[in-house]
Every structure is written in C-alpha cells, then in structure tokens.
Swiss-Prot record:
Reaction(s) the record says it catalyses: RNA(n) + a ribonucleoside 5'-triphosphate = RNA(n+1) + diphosphate
Recorded superkingdom: Eukaryota
Protein name: DNA-directed RNA polymerase subunit beta
CDD domains cross-referenced by the UniProt entry: RNA_pol_B_RPB2
Protein function: DNA-dependent RNA polymerase catalyzes the transcription of DNA into RNA using the four ribonucleoside triphosphates as substrates.
Organism taxonomic ancestry: Eukaryota, Viridiplantae, Streptophyta, Embryophyta, Tracheophyta
Entry keyword set: DNA-directed RNA polymerase, Nucleotidyltransferase, Plastid, Transcription, Transferase
EC id: 2.7.7.6
SUPFAM superfamilies: beta and beta-prime subunits of DNA dependent RNA-polymerase (SSF64484)
Length: 1070
C-alpha cells in the first residue's frame, strides 16, 4: 500500500478491473454511439420513415441466474429495448413503441460471459495504432530507401516511398504504384493547391511531364488513372459513379479511414491541427507526409520505432462488442428496409414492433463469442488461471499478426514494455512473444494506450504524487530503476542510483531522479509475481513457472506456502473463488450450501459453490470459514474456495525434499516420492467428469430412455432408476450403464428369433426391434455420481428432445506418471513410489517426502529454488511464513543468502535441531539411507519448497489399444487416445528394433498389428481355431499404396518374391 498526495492509500488495482471497465464503457458509450449512427429508413416512395431513438435504450436485468445458465446450457444475457418511431408522412402521424431488438451477453463478477452454458473470456488485442510511420530499409545496392506507411483504423496499409531520383510514389498494391500528384488530385486537390501547400515544390515539379499534367488535369482524369493502377485494368475506362463507388468501398474506406485514434496520431506526427471529428485521410495529410518523407531523404527528421508501445493500441472488449453491435444494426437496417417494402407491396400497415426482428443481434453476438479468435473458453483449472487468462494481451487475431509470419523483432522485449507488459510471462511455442500478459499495475487509457504508474519525486506541497504515464511520456523523465519499498521522502537514498532515460540505462545522482516505480512487482504479471526469489532464476525457467502455476490442480487439502511474495491474497480475492461479506451483520446459519447473514433488519442468503465442475474437470467448491453467531464486517472472508486457505492462494503443498540421486530413479527430471504422499492424501485431488447423451428422432421413430435393456447383464444396470437414469450417489465402475437408451431400427424377417416369429404368426404381436445405445462409463471413469441433469427442450412436431448429463466425482491420489513441479520451472514425472521406511531420513528421524535430481539446478540456472527450499525448512521449524519481495539485493549485497542463513541459524538454536544449520556446509545436512541406516557419503540439501501437482495426469494420458478403427486409405490404426488409436512405430523405432535383432517382433508390428489386411484376418481365424500363425506372403497395404502413388506419377514399380529353397522368382501384382 502506498500513500498518495492526498493522504489516501494506493493499493494493487483489481486484477479484473480492465475487463469491467471495458464492458462498462461499451454499455455507457458504445451502445449510444452505434445507435446514433443508425440512419432513418424510408421506403421507395418516401411515404414511411422508421427511426430509432438512441436516448431511450434500456437493458433489462437477466431473467436467469448464472448457475442456472451454466447447468442448463443457456446464455446469461440481458434484453435490449429501444424506442422506435414510425412516421407516415401523408398524415404526419408518428407511432412510437418500445421494441425488443435482441439480447446482449452480460459480463459477470469474474469478468467473463456465459454463452450456451460455457464461460468465455474476450482477451485484449494489441495492434499497430492507426497513423503514419516512417522507416528506412536497405535495397539490394545497400542504399537506404525511406518509406512512410499509413495504417487505417481498419488495418489497411498504404505506403509512400521516395526513389533515388527523389520522386514520390504511393503504392496502392504490391506491384502497382502511382505518383503522389495523381493520388492528391484523385482526393480532390488541384496542382496549384498542391504546390502552395508543400515545402519542396521544386521536387514535385521536377518530374512533372506533359503526360503527368494530363493525368492530373482534372479530378476525373486522376480518378481514372488511379483506378487503372488499383484495379489493374487495361485500356481506357470511362468515368462513372459506379467506378467512384467501387474505389470508395475497396480503397478509400479501408485504407483512408483513420478513426479517432488515427487522427490524433496523424496530427501529432505531422504537426497538424485538423479537428478530431475529421477521421478520414485528407489531401493535406498526404502533402505533409510527403514533406516529411523528403526531409528524411535529406537527413532531417526522425524515424519511427513501430514496436514501441506508443505506436500500439489496445483493442479491448468494449471495441470488439461495439463493432459487433454496429454490424448487427447494419443487418437490422437491411432487414427493416426489406420488411417495409414488403408491407407496402402487400398493402399492410406496419408497426415498429413488426418491422424489427430480435434474432439478428442475438445471433451476431452468439457467433462472435463462439467463433471469434479473441473469444476463448475460460481456463478454470485453478483460481489463478482465471485471472491470468483475463489479463492476456494478444497480437494475433483479425487485423493482427500470425504465428508463422511474425519476426523475431516483433516478439522480442522492448524497453517500453517495462511496467506495462510482463517481460517474462508469455506463451511457449510458435506464439512466443505474441501473447503476453499485462503488468500488475497497468491500466488502459482513453486512447487505447497502456499506462503505468510512477511516483513523482517532488516536494510534499505539490498535488498528486502518483502519475499514470502512457508509453513515450516516461522517456522524458529520469526514472529510478532500483529503488526501495519505502516512499517516504525523508528516507535518505543512495547518492548514486541506476535510472532509465530514453530507453537507456544510466547511473545518476539521486537529486536528478524525477520518477520512481511504486511497487517492486510493477514490471511483472500476476503469475510471475507469485515466484519468490525470481531474481535468482533464468528468465526461461521463470516463464515455465508462470505457465505451470496455471496448470496446478486444486488439492483436497490445500496449504499456504511458507515462502511467498505477498501477492497471494490479492490473487485469491480477485479470482472470485472466495465468498466475501457485502455488509456488516451476524451469521445466523451456515452449511455447505449457503450462509445466512442478518444485518440492518434484513437477512441475506449467500449461496456457496459445492462440487462445481470446471472446463478442465477440476472440482470447484467453497468451505465456510465463519461460525453461527459470529459478527462479521464488510469485506470479511466468509468462505474459502478451491486452492485458497485463509483468503490466500494455495496451489500446492510444502513437502520435505532432498536434492540427491537415488539409484537412478530420478534421472533426467524423474522424481522419487514416498508412499506417505499417497496414504495421507497429501497430493490427492478431486475431479468431476461430465458424460452426456441426447435422444434423437430416427426414421423408425424416437429413441427411448428406459431401464429395460435386453441382452445386458443385470449388474451393469443395477444403478438405474425406473426411468433408466443412474441414481445420484451411486458408485459406478467402467462398463456400467449411466443412461439406458434404445434406438429403433429396421430388422429383416430372417433375423427374427424363432419365438418372435411364433408370436407374430399366432397372436399377431409386432415384436419391436431396437438397438441398445446406452451411455456407459468409459475406461478410467469410475467414481461417485454426484449430479444428474435431465434437460428437455421444446422441439417440433410434438417431440421434445431430451439431453441427460451425468456428473461423476473422482478421487485421484498421486501415482507413477503424474507430473509435479515447483515454482521455479523445476518439473518432473513421478518414476517410483517408495515405502516410507526405504526413503532417506533426517537426523531427527523424519523421512524425506520427495527426491529431486541435483543436476537439474546448475545447468538450468534456477537457483531460486535453493533459497526457497532452505527458507521453507526454517519456516517449518520456526512455524513462520515469509513474504519476500523480488530483487532484494538492492538493499545490500547477498541479501537473499543472508536472510536464509540467518533464519536457518535461528531455527537450529530455538528448536534444538543443530543439523538445520551446519557452518561447514550451510543449508545441507547429513542424512541416512532408509534401507541400510548408513549416512550418505556427502551432505545433502534438504528443505521444504512449495510443490504443485499439475493437470497432466497419467489417468488422462495412459492408453492401450486392443481393437479399434483403421484409416481408410492406409489401413493403419488411427492416432490418438480418443479414437482408440495405436502407437506409431516410426523410422527410428524400426532402427532400434533392427539393432537388437528382434526380427519377429518387428515383422509383427509392421504387418499383423498394422496394415496387412489378410494377415490380420488370418490372426483372428488362427486364434479361434488354434495353431500357428502363418507368415504373410504378400506386401502390406502401405506398400501397395506407395505403388499406386508412383503409378499416378507414371512410374511403374514391380516386386518379386524369391523362394528360399530353389531361388525361383515368383512375380505378383502389388
């Protein structure tokens, strides 16, 4: 918390605040702006006029609750009503009605939207800001070529370039360019105006020939010349209105509309004073841009850095929703126009309500949330994941970059990112550097820029002391880089401090400093701010840690970290997983479903989340932390959520770890664990799987949900009720029926059983033939049924389709194959679970819980884990928790090492454990082999770091194929666990098998188990009858496919079989 100039307190802003502000700006301003753009609609004879009144729009409170929208697959939306008027000019009567024009998805308290029952988030997009940018490139001869790129608000680009002869060209396409005089004339300027408004008229006149004069003799000639170059049309086209309209739609509207931000940038770069409401590119802009380009040619002026954040803008959720609302109104305008014409043609009297359809706005937003690249399914693995996802900023998407074409310079860290975009937290893989995360204190300004706060170094009498500066503005100040937490001006700083000035790092006297950062974590994202001792880690490992914390599974019994950074509480508060008291009062009732609070004569019911499934199948829940009769204050925590303890983020567990090799079981990042982690449920987590089935109408009739399923064993349907649906609370195993369903089908006369034919012949009873299509528990799906949802939707022709969802809760202990990780990029796979008596143990008799490989530390340069490990041990012995700010070496040299050693020394003295700190090898200790009782040869580093269990679990990945589908072309098994696919034996695997000489196993893998059709059939027959499986004598299907492919290239390939006995050649067709 920081003191501002008015005596108030400045804290970390709400981490979801950017999403809330964007949506509120759309509701308050965006809707009104687009409704004002809605033009009056008239019929052909101009007898009827329709218009919307933007001042009187109204949003209705959603009719359903968030929880019901999730469970029933509905959209949590608000209905929009606008007053509309229909004027009949003959009688001058106006009929006004409040009409419903559609539903708009509403943002909830998490900063997300619920569309069709799915939580979705609209992430911010960072784009090149509209305006003009000058740059220089070297041509093939090493000569600098200067260009000016004009970027429109739509993302379209036009380039001005100057050649060796100082001629100015405007490039309208990749291959076509025209003279700047032709472009200016086509935009409405004559030659005299051009000469009078440029600084270098002699340069423009130097290449003006008779042919050029004819082209710019009139506006029509200039437009025709421009159209020929732009549309690549030969001959002499004739001037017409349609030609001008085509140019307007395809060029001027897409490349010359600057928008509000573009006009501001253009005025600032070219030193113009054109009004802000004039958002189109003007001839004056072109001429001023030409002057500046000529000046750059002669060494005057400066080039632009297009990767600087002052040349970027943020396209927030408000801009995206406003664009889609404008698109829906354009569609509505066309629909109303057609409806008016149809009503007049059929001589009907229209009303405003009859003219407007609400489906256009609703379907526009549903398609946006479902199909737009920037609208993504909210990642809800743990509370931290939700916050980080909402604070992402992407360079991808419409109008942005692509992962294939983005250069290294665009992906790299820029000095202007400091305090605005985290230099650590980004995606791994092809999108590295293109998807970033906003810094913890950043905010979005009015012009779409990222603003970072700074503390102003001045006298106490000056006004506000915390300034929010946009990119570029802070470069004019001396900004102290390494400064302490205290902002009291009376504290004497060092005489010389490091500082930033104009993207350079300097060392200056303290008196010259103008600004300083307000928080040690100001430069990092929320995920990176949770890493203690981050300054001792390599940046690549810090990046991995930021990403892996988002993959941590909420555990059954969470635990606060011993060593943290202090940001854990803010992350938990803004995640929405906690229940917070909205007013003072007294708790009168509490259970697992709700908390009742009485205050001011009112009783408020606060519902709690109980066993809610996230989209990553993790279990979200809330546990009450207050008692009946307890008095509470506003803002007090009433209930903890998943992965939170006492209002702090708790993603993992602090366990006893030793860094040592152990019989090769922790080779190459493998991890050895004790069985007590399994039996004591240390890393046990709950997961909820959702299984769904839907009834359809077939040509033979509707499908039926029932518990009378023929040809199924009784124990498979033991859990079904009378309706054929599994009972809530049942324990189910793989293969059990969750929902019994029969599908009618056509059966031939010959396929009836004898008793069925007898019933038909004697009694005339029609035997129904149905196919069993039940919903069954898949392999690895055992668990407890915690919820069953039966959803009926209204269908046509008197049939209501049914959708049944079954939720199964699974308890998963940690096992071999699961992935665990620390907070420093140190990750590994469980390789073996040892009995606790075989694990290494300490001098006080405690056995180690987990063994890491020490070779994983020096090469990866993530030494922060060593500090956390040792300080965690001291904290567990002293029963203390530490919150460490990053870059503490600015206070004194070796500050991290000193605090760790001092705490270990204090722990060894106060707890009578002298082994905790041994001066010969501080931080290490002599430990014993649990199998023999002997001490290990060398002292071992032991401690209590914070370990996370990640979502990558072996239960979701392990797979074996007994039988399955084959690809149609290659006849080889499909790929992937979901398709019951096989494991590919590639080229290198074949080499390995050849190296060991296992010829029969290799032949089996390449024929029987792969794509030899006849051999597969013979294996089945031989298995049933018994005997020896014969060796395949012809080529497999993949070889036959290769032959056919070569034949398509007119290459004939034949093969021969040579007998081993008499070497006779037997030729067969491939």
């Amino acid at each position: 918390m920081l003191e501002d100039g008015k005596g108030g307190i400045t804290t970390i802003p709400g981490l979801n605040q950017i999403q809330f502000e964007g949506f509120c700006r759309f509701i308050d301003q965006g809707l009104t702006e687009e409704l004002y753009k809605f033009q009056k609609i008239e019929d052909i004879d101009q007898e009827i006029e329709f218009q919307l009144f933007a001042e009187t729009y109204q949003l209705v409170e959603p009719l359903i609750k968030e929880r019901d929208a999730v469970y029933d697959s509905l959209t949590y939306s608000s209905e929009l009503y606008v007053s509309a008027g229909l004027i009949r000019k003959a009688s001058k009567d106006m009929q006004e009605q409040k009409i419903f024009i559609g539903s708009i998805p509403i943002m909830n308290s998490l900063g997300t939207s619920i569309v069709n029952g799915i939580y979705r988030i609209v992430i911010n997009q960072i784009l090149q800001s509209p305006g003009i940018y000058y740059r220089s490139e070297l041509d093939q001869n090493g000569i600098s070529v200067y260009t000016g790129t004009i970027i429109s608000d739509w993302g379209g680009r036009s380039e001005l370039e100057i050649d060796r002869k100082a001629r100015i060209w405007a490039r309208v396409s990749r291959k076509q360019k025209i003279s700047i005089l032709v472009l200016s004339s086509a935009m409405g300027s004559n030659l005299r105006e051009i000469i009078e408004n440029v600084c270098y008229p002699e340069i423009l006149l130097s290449f003006l020939r008779d042919k050029e004069k004819k082209k710019i003799g009139s506006k029509e000639n200039a437009i025709l010349e421009f159209y020929k170059k732009f549309a690549c049309v030969g001959g002499d086209p004739l001037f017409s209105e349609s030609l001008c309209k085509e140019l307007q739609n395809k060029f001027f509207q897409q490349r010359c509309e600057l928008g509000r931000i573009g006009r501001r940038n253009m005025n600032r770069r070219l030193h113009l004073d054109i009004p802000q409401n004039n958002t189109f590119l003007l001839p004056r802009d072109i001429l001023e841009a030409t002057d500046l380009l000529i000046g750059l040619k002669f060494g005057m002026g400066t080039l632009d850095d297009m990767n600087h954040l002052q040349n970027k803008r943020i396209r927030s959720v408000a801009d995206l929703l406003q664009d889609k609302f404008g698109l829906a109104l354009v569609r509505l305008e066309n629909a109303v126009q057609g409806t008016i014409c149809g009503a007049i043609h059929h001589k009907k009297i229209p009303t405003p309500q009859n003219l407007v359809t609400s489906t256009l706005l609703t379907t526009t937003y549903e398609s946006f949330f479902g199909l737009h690249p920037l609208s993504q399914v909210l990642d809800r693995t743990n509370p931290l994941t939700q916050i980080v996802h909402a604070r992402k900023v992407s360079s991808l998407g419409p109008g942005g970059l692509t992962g294939r074409t983005a250069s290294f310079r665009i992906r790299d860290i820029h000095p202007s990112h400091y305090g605005r975009i985290c230099p650590i937290d980004t995606s791994e893989g092809i999108n590295v550097g293109l998807i970033g995360s906003l810094a913890i204190h950043v905010r979005i300004g009015n012009w779409g820029s990222l603003e970072s706060p700074f503390f102003k170094i001045s006298d106490r009498l000056t006004g506000v002391r915390v300034l929010h500066l946009s990119p570029g503005r802070d470069e004019y100040y001396m900004v102290a880089a390494g400064n302490s937490l205290a902002l009291n001006q009376d504290i004497q700083e060092d005489l010389v401090v490091p500082a930033r000035f104009r993207q350079e790092f300097l060392t200056i006297a303290w008196e010259q400093v103008n600004l300083r950062s307000i928080f040690p974590f100001q430069y990092f994202s929320i995920g990176t701010s949770l890493i203690p001792f981050i300054e001792h880690n390599d940046a690549n490992r810090a990046l991995m840690s930021s990403n892996m914390q988002r993959q941590a599974v909420p555990l059954a019994w969470s635990e606060k970290c011993i060593v943290g950074t202090g940001v854990e509480r803010q992350a938990a508060l803004d995640s929405g997983s906690l229940a917070i008291a909205e007013r003072e009062g007294r708790v009168i009732y509490t259970d697992t479903e709700k908390i009742l609070v009485s205050g001011d004569g009112k009783t408020i019911s606060i519902p709690l989340v109980m066993y809610q499934r996230s989209n990553k199948n993790t279990c979200m829940y809330q546990q009450p932390q207050v008692r009946r009769g307890q008095f509470i204050k506003k803002g007090q925590i009433l209930a903890d959520g998943a992965a939170t303890v006492e209002g702090e983020l708790a993603l993992g567990k602090s366990v006893l770890v030793a860094y040592m090799p152990w019989e090769g079981y922790n080779y190459e990042d493998a991890v050895l664990i004790s069985e007590c982690l399994v039996y004591e449920d240390i890393f046990t987590s709950f997961h909820i799987r959702k299984y769904e089935i839907q009834t359809h109408v077939t040509t033979q009739g509707p499908e039926k949900v029932t518990n009378e399923i023929p040809h199924l064993e009784a124990h498979l349907i033991r859990n079904l009720d009378k309706n054929g649906i599994v009972l809530q609370g049942s324990w189910v195993e793989p293969g059990d029926v969750l929902v019994g369903k029969l599908t009618p089908q056509v059966v031939k006369e010959s396929s009836y059983a004898p008793e069925d034919r007898l019933l038909r012949a004697i009694l005339g009873i029609q035997v129904s033939a149905s196919k069993e299509t039940c919903l069954k528990v898949p392999i690895g799906g055992r668990g407890r049924v915690i919820d069953v949802r039966w959803i009926q939707k209204k269908g046509g022709y008197g049939y209501n389709p049914e959708k049944i969802r079954v939720y199964i809760l699974q308890k998963r202990e940690i096992k071999v194959g699961d992935k665990v990780a620390g907070r420093h990029g140190n990750k590994g796979i469980i390789s073996k679970i040892l009995p606790r008596q075989d694990m290494p143990y300490l001098q006080d008799g405690r056995s180690v819980d987990l063994v890491f490989n020490p070779l994983g530390v020096p090469s990866r340069m993530n030494v922060g884990q060593i500090f956390e490990c040792s300080l965690g041990l001291a904290g567990s012995l002293l029963d203390r928790h530490y919150r460490i700010a990053p870059f503490d070496e600015r206070y004194e040299q070796e500050a991290s090492r000193k605090i760790v050693f001092s705490e270990l020394y204090e722990a060894s003295k106060q707890t009578a454990n002298p082994w905790a700190f041994e001066p010969e090898y501080p931080g290490k200790s002599r430990i014993f082999d649990g199998r023999t009782g002997n001490t290990f040869e060398h002292p071992v580093l032991i401690g209590k770091p914070y370990i996370l269990k990640l979502i990558h679990q072996v239960d979701d990945k392990i797979h074996g194929r007994s039988s399955g589908h084959y690809a149609l072309v290659t006849q080889q098994p499909l790929r992937g666990r979901a398709k019951q696919g096989g494991q590919r034996v590639g080229e290198m695997e074949v080499w390995a098998l050849e190296g060991f000489g296992v010829a029969h196993i290799l032949q089996e893998m390449l024929t029987y188990k792969s794509d030899h059709i006849r051999a597969r059939q013979e294996v089945l027959g031989t298995t049933i009858v018994g005997g020896t499986i014969p060796n395949p004598k012809n080529a497999p299907e993949s070889f036959r496919l290769l032959v056919r492919e070569l034949r398509s290239l007119a290459l004939e390939l034949t093969h021969f079989l040579v007998s081993e006995k008499n070497f006779q050649v037997n030729k067969r067709e491939a």
